[in-house]
Structures are given as C-alpha cells and as structure tokens.
C-alpha cells in the first residue's frame, strides 16, 4: 500500500492540536500521559525507557515505521486492543500522512 507523502507543516499543526497534550518529541523530553516519542521510529511497541505501558502495548511486538504508524493512527484501540491511549484516531489518510511526515523529522 505505502504511506502517501505528507506535509511536515500540516503535520506539526496536527501534532500541536491533537497529540502534544499527551506526548513530547524532543530528545530528553519528559513523558506526559503518553510517552516521549523521540527515536521511536524503528523501536518496538512499549519500549520507551521509563514509561509505564499497558501489557497490550508491550505484547504487540511490532516495530514502529511509516506503515505500522499509518495503520495505528487510524484507530489505535483496534490496532492495539487494550492500549491506554485514549485518542480515537485520524480517519483521513492525508492527515495521518502529514503527522507521520512531521514525526519522522521531529523525533530524530
């Protein structure tokens, strides 16, 4: 399938509006309600040091990349049943692509 190309600036706005209340992205950023996302591309689910994940998240065992994140962000509770993340998801493919484009840049 492949993830469509996203717009970093639109993704940043989405992050601020929909994600920043629970997540940080900068190196050394604090965990909030959700984990700091720095360096999460290429990491397995439930692996950010110092964050208390649900058993479901730890057990999922997938590696975060564009494709897995694209599917997850559409409906987190469907992708990882039992996740603590209360976010309902982004139904529009272009919004998910924009957010992923931003996260790829912001979490390096």
UniProtKB/Swiss-Prot annotation:
UniProt binding sites for heme c: 19, 22-23, 85
Coiled coil: none
Protein's UniProt keywords contain Mitochondrion: yes
Gene3D superfamilies named in the record: Cytochrome c-like domain (1.10.760.10)
Keywords: Electron transport, Heme, Iron, Metal-binding, Mitochondrion, Respiratory chain, Transport
Cell location: Mitochondrion intermembrane space
UniProt modification remark: Binds 1 heme c group covalently per subunit.
Signal peptide range: none
Family: Belongs to the cytochrome c family.
Role: Electron carrier protein. The oxidized form of the cytochrome c heme group can accept an electron from the heme group of the cytochrome c1 subunit of cytochrome reductase. Cytochrome c then transfers this electron to the cytochrome oxidase complex, the final protein carrier in the mitochondrial electron-transport chain.
Listed name of the protein: Cytochrome c
């Amino acid at each position: 399938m492949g993830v469509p190309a996203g717009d970093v600036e639109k993704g940043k706005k989405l992050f601020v509006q929909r994600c920043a209340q629970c997540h940080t992205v900068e190196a050394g950023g604090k965990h909030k309600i959700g984990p700091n996302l720095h360096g999460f591309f290429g990491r397995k689910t439930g692996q950010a040091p110092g964050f208390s994940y649900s058993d479901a998240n730890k057990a999922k065992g997938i590696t975060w990349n564009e494709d897995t994140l694209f599917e997850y962000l559409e409906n987190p509770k469907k992708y990882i049943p039992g996740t603590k993340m209360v976010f309902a998801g982004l139904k529009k493919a272009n919004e998910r692509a924009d957010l992923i484009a931003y996260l790829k840049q912001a979490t390096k």
